[in-house]
């Protein structure tokens, strides 16, 4: 289990994200799409179109991490873009 700092803000990128993007591509999405600093200690969550893959981008003050979760059954429930 990865322990994130208490009180860390979590941002969900609405809609589907191109899951071919890696750390740098997602960091660019955070800057351009969400208007946030990807190095600010917040968690940024992205979901692929089929809904079975989720990526979390996080900078812990030392370096950037990219966590990936793929589920075998069902889908991640995700908000639609406003």
Question: What residues fall within each predicted segment?
Answer:
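Polybasic/polar functional segments that serve as interface/processing modules
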Residues: 1-82
């Amino acid at each position: 289990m990865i322990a994130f700092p208490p009180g860390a803000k979590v941002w969900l990128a609405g809609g589907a994200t191109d899951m071919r993007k890696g750390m740098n591509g997602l960091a660019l999405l955070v800057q351009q799409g969400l208007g946030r600093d990807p190095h600010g200690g917040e968690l940024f969550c992205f979901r692929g179109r089929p809904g079975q893959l989720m990526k979390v981008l996080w900078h812990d003050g030392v370096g950037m991490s990219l966590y990936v979760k793929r589920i075998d059954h069902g889908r991640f429930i995700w908000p639609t873009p406003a």
